Amino acid sequence: MTSDSIGDMLTRVRNALAARHPKVDVPASRLKAEIARILKEEGYIANFKVAEEGVKKVIKIYLKYSPNNAPVITRIERVSRPGCRVYVGSGDIPRVQGGLGINILTTPRGVMTGRMAHKEGIGGELLCQIW
């Protein structure tokens, strides 16, 4: 049992990309499904689906690679952790790699990218950065 389920999900994705696996399974939760939805919308993963394996639900994340078999996700980092939460206002949302990457935030209006949160003028907890 891990105390940081989002960190565990990001680590599983990072390890699967390093090993060039076509997909990775992570234990399901609504927050992890929302993070996977954003990754799909932004083009970082090919697809995902929530499936039931026996009693437990899992999220199957289908990873995306470029034509020369390099992972589309160069780096994926956890920012806010259970031991050190990081909250940002709408004006304090950092740019990732000069605008080439994305932030994922959890806000009062749900999970969204840093760009969407800035556009709506809301801040929240900065979960992770991807580029």
Locations of regions flagged by a protein language model:
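Core subunits and conserved enzymes of cellular information-processing
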Residues: 1-131
